[in-house]
Every structure is written in structure tokens, then in C-alpha cells.
Regions:
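Small-residue-rich hydrophobic transmembrane alpha-helices
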Residues: 44-104, 141-160, 267-325, 329-331, ...
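Residue-level signal for short hydrophobic patches within transmembrane helices
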Residues: 3, 7-26, 30, 53-60, ...
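Transmembrane alpha-helix boundary and packing residues in multipass membrane permease domains
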Residues: 17, 21, 33, 70, ...
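Transmembrane helical elements of multi-pass membrane transporters/channels
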Residues: 12-31, 133, 144, 167, ...
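Short alpha-helical transmembrane segments in multi-pass integral membrane proteins
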Residues: 1-14, 72-137, 181-237, 293-358, ...
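Helix-terminus/linker motif at the lipid-water interface of multi-pass membrane proteins
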Residues: 26-45, 114-121, 177-184, 244-277, ...
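Hydrophobic transmembrane alpha-helices of multi-pass small-molecule transporters
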Residues: 56-59, 171-175, 201-205, 277-280, ...
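Short runs within selected transmembrane alpha-helices of multi-pass transporters and secretion channels
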Residues: 65, 134-152, 160-171, 189-204, ...
Length: 452
């Protein structure tokens, strides 16, 4: 990450990440396709209506894994083996504790949270059932995500891809067996998901355990070291809060979609799944930007750090434009995989119009905070993202949408919030970058004076 062609290394790092995300979404799409095709539109709406809510519950803790990624990348690049080992064991312990806590919270509060979202009576029972089963697998989900974050920190994005391929294939097969053969509906989809999460968890922990490097995992060493936990939290908690609060705005948006009935809900579920393919593609570039920035920051290569961001911008815009236009152009054909209901497809296409061709704005919005987190600055980007993204959407949902009730007006809030947030993040990045370069120059001058 710290030497050689940046673009080549970015692509080789980001491509497995991108494929991992696409695979995960493809297997999630199998959930939706199978339940939509063989259990009906109510079951499809039930599974889809939980997506934003599950993200709210989980993203705080997944965000904290970014702290482990940044800290691990910095220590690994600098050759600080003891600190790297302590980071690994602290992160895995945090993953286990947070996973167990999330399982209890999700099971206990699923029904109440869905009621607060205004989930229609005809789907809430199925939504609650799916959500409770899903949360039973949360310890496995958290352990996999934290383990994969550690592997990304050392530049390994290929093995997580292999693990997802194995677990996701299992998930797809189990979906077909449990839903079609045993007619378990949303329960079958939930059970298949939990089993696949358990498999991916076992594979990533085994990988860390078998390692002979500084990121080797030893279960006897699992404990939280306060100093490392604080450093992980300094980067991870703001990232997690940002993701959680943004998803809260998506919950509000889901509630607004719910007001149009189960047809619009099913359309949003299908569109949101396609929307996810765009997200994982640009997010892989953001994660690459964060990891590359962190390693170069750790060894003091600030000019290379600037070139990393430049190349990431080129890569992110190119990927998101190509995929966004492609998804919209071929949207009607792709959506028929999810459902054959013309009304559902029409709703989905109306949503995709405003969220696909403009998605490169979202990629740019995330890149600058990614670079800032790589330098250890996470709080201010979080605040700006919350103000720009969530603030805009809340004003839109409660101010503009009630006056012009349509799916089109509702989803214009996405590009509007992205553009406003980009402006604020660019200004923030300019000042932080200037401070980092100045501090580094002063430190170099002080060292030179002492040597003289």
C-alpha cells in the first residue's frame, strides 16, 4: 500500500472487496427472490421492511470495526507487532460482546420497533418473526465483520471473498430447501441466513488462528485492553454513529414508503436491493481509501496519501456512473427477477430514477470522510454527515414531502442530501489536510534541529 503504482494496488485491493459485497448482496437477493416468488408479496414486504431497522441496530457496532481496521493498518505498516496483536484481541473481544448484546436487543424489541415504523398489520407478524431469527445470528455476524476488518488492515481482501463465497452459496441452497421444499417462508430465509453467518464466522476466526503473523488470534489472549479500545472507539464510534443516524433517516423514509401500502413497500424492497449493489461498489473504494491512507499516514508518506485520494475519486466516479446508468437502463428486466407484479416494478423504477444515475455523488460524499478516518480524524466528518444527510432528509420528509406526496418527491431527498454533504466534507478535508501537513513539517524540522 505504501509503494508502487497506487491505482493498480487500489484496484487489486478494492476488487475483492467489491466482489465480496456483490456476492453478499446476491445472496441477500436470493433471500428476497425466493421469498417473493414462493411466499408472496406480503412475505417480500415483510423481509424488506426490516432492512433499514436492522441496519440501525447493527451499524454502530460495524462502524466500530472500522476503528480496528484503521488502527490495525497503522500498526501493521509501522511494524509494531505487539500493538497489532493487542488490537486484534481487543477487537475480537468487542465483537463477541457486542454481538451477544445485539442478539438480546433485537429479539426483545423487534415487534415494538416495527410498530413504531408504522409497519402495516398484514405484514408485521412476518416481519417480527424474520427479525428475531436474524438477530439470533448476530454474534456470528459481528465476529465475521471484525475479523474481516483485521484482514483488510493487513491488505488481505481475497480470503474474506472466499469465505463469503462458501457461506453465501450455503445460504442460497438452504433458502431453496427451507422455503420451497419445507414451506417455511420468512422463517426459512432467516434460518438460512443465521447458518451462513455462522459458517463465515468460523472461517474467518480459523484464518486468524492459523496465521503466523502479528495478527494471529489466540483465544486465551481474548481480553479488552483499555488503551487500544479507546483508540478503536475514537475512530469507530463516530463512524458507527454516522452510519446509525443515517440509517435512522432511512427508517423515516421507510415509514413514508409504508404509507403508500404493500405494493410500494415491495417495490422499495426490490429497488433497495439493486441500490445496495451500487453501495458496495463505491464503498469498497472508500474502504480502500481509508486503509491506504492509514498505512501511508503511519509511515509519514503524506504526498502519496494525497495521490491515494485523487485515484480513489477517479475510480469511485467511474464505477458508480457505469453501474448506476446500467442499473437504471436495464432496471425493468432486472426487477422481473424479484417480482412479476407490474405495479411493484413501476414503483421500483420510479425510485431507481433518482437513486442510481446520481449515485456517484454518494461515492464522493463517503470518500472524504474515509480519507479523514485514515488519518485518525473521525468526529468532525461524522457531525457533517449527520447534518448534511440526515438533516436534509428530515426537512424533506416532514417539510416538502407532505405537500407533494409521491415516491418521486420522496426520493429526490437522496441526491439533494448527498450534494450538500459533499460541499461540507470537502471544506473539512481541506482544513484537516493542511493541519496534518503543517504538523508533519514542524515535526520533521524539530527532529532535524535536534540532530544538528
Amino acid at each position: 500500500m505504501c509503494n508502487g503504482s497506487i491505482m493498480d494496488k487500489l484496484i487489486s485491493f478494492a476488487l475483492p472487496l467489491m466482489l465480496s459485497g456483490v456476492l453478499q448482496l446476491m445472496f441477500n437477493a436470493v433471500d428476497i427472490i425466493v421469498v417473493g416468488r414462493f411466499s408472496g408479496s406480503q412475505a417480500l414486504a415483510a423481509v424488506g421492511s426490516t432492512t433499514a431497522l436492522i441496519a440501525v441496530f447493527t451499524n454502530l457496532f460495524i462502524g466500530i470495526s472500522l476503528g480496528a481496521n484503521v488502527l490495525g493498518a497503522r500498526f501493521y505498516a509501522a511494524g509494531r507487532h505487539r500493538e497489532m496483536s493487542e488490537t486484534v484481541h481487543t477487537a475480537i473481544t468487542l465483537a463477541l460482546i457486542s454481538g451477544i448484546a445485539m442478539a438480546f436487543i433485537g429479539v426483545l424489541f423487534a415487534r415494538g420497533a416495527l410498530e413504531l415504523m408504522g409497519t402495516p398489520d398484514d405484514v408485521i407478524r412476518l416481519s417480527t418473526l424474520y427479525m428475531r431469527i436474524y438477530f439470533c445470528g448476530m454474534p456470528f455476524f459481528m465476529l465475521y465483520n471484525y475479523g474481516a476488518a483485521i484482514l483488510r488492515a493487513v491488505g488481505d481482501t481475497k480470503r474474506p471473498l472466499i469465505f463469503l463465497l462458501i457461506s453465501g452459496s450455503t445460504n442460497a441452497v438452504l433458502n431453496l430447501v427451507l422455503v420451497i421444499k419445507f414451506d417455511l417462508g420468512v422463517a426459512g430465509v432467516g434460518i438460512a441466513t443465521v447458518i451462513s453467518q455462522m459458517i463465515s464466522c468460523v472461517l474467518v476466526l480459523r484464518c486468524l488462528y492459523k496465521s503466523d503473523s502479528s495478527y494471529q488470534l489466540r483465544f486465551s489472549k481474548l481480553k479488552i485492553k483499555k488503551a487500544y479500545m479507546i483508540q478503536i472507539f475514537q475512530v469507530g464510534i463516530p463512524a458507527g454513529i454516522q452510519s446509525t443516524v443515517i440509517n435512522l433517516s432511512n427508517v423515516l423514509l421507510q415509514s413514508s414508503v409504508n404509507s403508500f401500502g404493500s405494493t410500494a413497500m415491495a417495490g422499495y424492497t426490490a429497488a433497495n436491493n439493486l441500490f445496495g449493489f451500487l453501495y458496495v461498489s463505491v464503498n469498497s473504494v472508500t474502504l480502500a481509501c481509508m486503509s491506504f491512507t492509514s498505512q501511508n499516514y503511519g509511515v509519514g508518506k503524506l504526498k502519496r496519501m494525497d495521490r491515494v485520494l485523487r485515484d480513489c475519486i477517479i475510480l469511485s466516479v467511474s464505477v458508480s456512473l457505469a453501474l448506476g446508468v446500467g442499473v437504471y437502463v436495464f432496471g425493468p428486466e432486472i426487477l422481473q427477477i424479484y417480482t412479476t407484479d407490474p405495479a411493484v416494478i413501476q414503483c421500483a423504477m420510479e425510485i431507481l430514477l433518482y437513486t442510481t444515475v446520481t449515485y456517484f455523488f454518494c461515492g464522493l460524499m463517503d470518500l472524504f470522510p474515509g480519507a479523514l478516518r485514515g488519518m485518525g480524524h473521525s468526529a468532525v466528518p461524522m457531525i457533517l454527515s449527520v447534518i448534511g444527510t440526515v438533516g436534509t432528509r428530515i426537512v424533506w420528509i416532514y417539510g416538502i414531502f407532505p405537500q407533494h406526496r409521491s415516491l418521486a418527491i420522496l426520493f429526490i431527498s437522496y441526491p439533494a442530501s448527498w450534494i450538500l454533504t459533499i460541499v461540507m466534507q470537502v471544506i473539512c478535508f481541506y482544513f484537516v489536510r493542511r493541519h496534518v501537513h503543517r504538523t508533519h513539517a514542524e515535526l520533521g524540522a524539530n527532529i532535524e534541529n535536534k540532530q544538528q
